[in-house]
Amino acid sequence: MFSNKPVIGVVFGGKSSEHEVSIKSAKTIYNALSHLSNKERYVARPVYIDKYGYWHDYIFSESILYDKKDHLIFEDRRVNLTNLSNMEDIDVWFPCLHGPNGEDGVIQGLFKSTGKPFVGSGVLGSALGMDKIAMKSVFKSYNLPQVPYVSLNKADIQNNLYMKSIYEQINKIINYPCFIKPANLGSSVGITKAYSKEEFITGIEFAAKYDERIIVEKSIEGRELECGVLGKSIMKSSVVGEVKFQTDWYTYESKYNANLSSTIIPADLNIEISNKIQKLAIEACKAINAYGLARVDFFYQESTQQIYINEVNTLPGFTKTSMYPTLWEASGLKLEKLVASLIEIAKE
């Protein structure tokens, strides 16, 4: 042990296409752990996973956070993964990973095997939260409101008879425009919006480059709202925020470019709708067994006052433009206290 204070292993990077976002999130968390009261309570240790899946020591990992990697020899800083489960200096793992191998239950299973607590959902909640098809199936079983959708596998694209049935379902229950998404990616990676059958086919082929499983959703003309959830045995929800963007839809570029999107926190909603969204956010998390932290995304049609759950993100971002920490700050919980709360929840 480095001291009597709990050592927090901040894990980031990874093989996912959201690698760079993960680094930004980790820097926010690491800085929050090194700030004022948290510095007196915890010892923060960064653990970087490179794009090839290699784990690296604390010195090299910290250099990645502060962009000093050119001064170090890359190969000499790798950590033997077989020894990772016996890293006695880590008391609590804090994953800042996004996408496959980070928030899909894979690394959660590894953490569980170490016998050390970790921030966020367990294997089941993470896996269900990552796979949009599995998540929506659970929502359906709990009668939670969501937009119409159909799903298919990459192998189905070459099956003309099967694709004919998909086209029929699109025309019958979804219509155009519609969204085509890889089932297991976040940050709008691999997503297209199709206005015709031709664009739909192109979108399917594009999504198939990222995932074997593909989901097609009805496009809803409405407001995009988000709500944070915090807790395990007792869950609470944040104020509701709204995302506005200059692009046709909430693309990867608009998510991480402050000039292309903006947020309104709290969202301009009547109290009844706001309360309903906060309640649904917790219900959605409980349905898929997500806990610790989560951001739940919604669509809201003002004309019908209909609320649709879009998805649960079990490891939301902590970048400068990320909604989750901003929602909680607007709810009276500043970043440093939020991070400390997440660690204490992990130890429950």
From Swiss-Prot:
GO terms under biological process: cell wall organization; peptidoglycan biosynthetic process; regulation of cell shape
Summarize where ATP binds, as residue positions. 171-226
Query: Which cofactors does it use?
Result: Mg(2+); Mn(2+)
On whether Iron-sulfur is a keyword of this UniProt record, the answer is no
Q: Which UniProt keywords apply?
A: ATP-binding, Cell shape, Cell wall biogenesis/degradation, Cytoplasm, Ligase, Magnesium, Manganese, Metal-binding, Nucleotide-binding, Peptidoglycan synthesis
One Pfam short name = Dala_Dala_lig_N
The pathway it acts in is: Cell wall biogenesis; peptidoglycan biosynthesis
Residues the entry annotates as binding Mg(2+) 1: 297, 311
Domain ATP-grasp span(s) in chain numbering:
136-344
Q: Spell out the GO cellular component terms annotated for this protein, sorted alphabetically and separated by semicolons.
A: cytosol
Q: Which Gene3D superfamilies match?
A: 3.40.50.20, ATP-grasp fold, A domain (3.30.1490.20), ATP-grasp fold, B domain (3.30.470.20)
Any one GO MF term held by the record is: ATP binding
Q: What Enzyme Commission number(s) apply to this enzyme?
A: 6.3.2.4
Q: Where in the cell is it found?
A: Cytoplasm
Presence of keyword Nucleotide-binding: yes
| Binding residues annotated for Mg(2+) 2, in chain numbering | 311, 313
Under catalytic activity, the entry for this protein gives:
2 D-alanine + ATP = D-alanyl-D-alanine + ADP + phosphate + H(+)
The cofactor remark states: Binds 2 magnesium or manganese ions per subunit.
Q: Known InterPro entries for this protein? A: ATP-grasp (IPR011761), ATP_grasp_subdomain_1 (IPR013815), D-Ala_lig_Van_CS (IPR000291), D_ala_D_ala (IPR005905), Dala_Dala_lig_C (IPR011095), Dala_Dala_lig_N (IPR011127), PreATP-grasp_dom_sf (IPR016185)
Q: Which HAMAP family match?
A: Dala_Dala_lig
Q: What does this protein do?
A: Cell wall formation.
Cross-referenced NCBIfam families: D_ala_D_alaTIGR, PRK01966.1-4
Family, per entry: Belongs to the D-alanine--D-alanine ligase family.
Q: What is this protein called?
A: D-alanine--D-alanine ligase
Source organism per UniProt: Prochlorococcus marinus (strain NATL1A)
